[in-house]
Amino acid sequence: GEDRYLLAWTTTPWTLPANTALAVNGDLEYSEVKVDGERYILASELVEKVLQDEKHQPLKYEVVGKLNGNDLVGLSYEPLFMDRGENAHKVWSADYVSAEDGTGIVHLAPVYGEEDYALAREKNFPAVHTIDENGFFTEGDWKGSNVWEVNKQIAKDLKERGIVWKIDYIRHSYPHCHRCGTKLMYRAHPSWFMDIDGQREEMLEQNTEVINWFPSHVKHGRFEKNILAAPDWNLSRDRFWATAMPVWEGTDENGEKQQIIVGS
């Protein structure tokens, strides 16, 4: 049969070398459309919005089929770059995929997005790093290059390979460091967490029975509400500001490792 293309989208081309999956919404309707002899699949609600040329003029197209999002789940596709092995490069369902923006099909690079990472853990597809903690690529044609310097080049190279259907430029918000103004890169890395759920009741009890607050309304006000809503606490801080964790480790005169946690 004819080749069919899943029309996925991203605002972060630098994450594409780490792509290991695509996500659709199982409850959305998708259309298979024919444009200039090529077949593309995207959310039905977005067909007219997406099928425009680079001057935002409507393209001629033919709808050749309709699918439910769940019909796409389990399909495999050819990787953009390296083959990431077993269970990679498949389509999964995710309820956070919508028809508000993009194409209704989302590119997934698990180590560079919180929702992507959660889905990868749930469905057991690979999560791979292509960028080190300083923002430099560790593999491929861009090895040693800074992520922001090659962001546009990645998109252009894929366009030349015939993989990118369209490059568009939009203005959208992006997180920056409020201290130095540099762009932030979301990147997963091994960390230690404190199990807050496992000791939430004890923390609430200590807050009520042991700690004296000044002013007193903080006890059952802001602080208690913080405890009730707190997620697991990430202890592995990489920040160079704020208060350090008061944990002291060392070896005593007998050669035994000692650890002291300084209380307030």
Question: Residue ranges of each PLM-predicted region?
Answer:
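Protease-associated
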Residues: 17, 21, 28-105, 114
